[in-house]
Amino acid sequence: MYKRQVRINPTGSVTVFTGSHSHGQGHETVFAQIVHEKLGVAFDSIDVVHGDTGRVPFGVGTVGSRSLAVGGPALMRSIDKIIDKGKKIAAHLLDASYDEITFKDGEFSVSNSNKFIAFSDVVGAAYVPGNYPIETLEPGLEETSFYDPPNLTYPAGAHICEIEIDPETGQIDIVNYCVSDDFGIVMNPMIVEGCLLYTSDAADEE
């Protein structure tokens, strides 16, 4: 089970608190990618906090390739909650009903009209509640979500190693090494390729 906390700061920057600690796998990059793609905020305005037990939420660590498969949905749930609250704020600001509001590319817009408001303006309204539905919504934009998968995931893959063995000395030399893995949805191809090459290079270690 993983917990993700997402905080939209008054400046419009985003802070993600995660209990899954990166050991070089690129969690910070991929989690920031998810926030960027879902909210449309600038990539360099997203800060991912991990490894600080005084600040981060509950998490079981990065084991069994679970950080994205399990932590990713928890992060997306928190973002969806923020978008949902943002739609309520936008509906108030645009004098529309909640059902009329859609969110895309960093903007809340009213269906079948040219009325819209930027995500940054909704954030500002959330923290300066002068024109805000204070009776029904608490100020601020910060959400937390848990995700516990209903079952385990098992990736499929095959590794084939061709070796030569010196019959006199017993010396083993790797001639060729082929890897085939099913990764599912790849968020960042460069990171996946790097992890794959690193694990393959480990075969040459002594």
Predicted regions and their residues:
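Single conserved hydrophobic/aromatic residue that forms the stacking wall/gate
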Residues: M1-Y2, Y198-E206
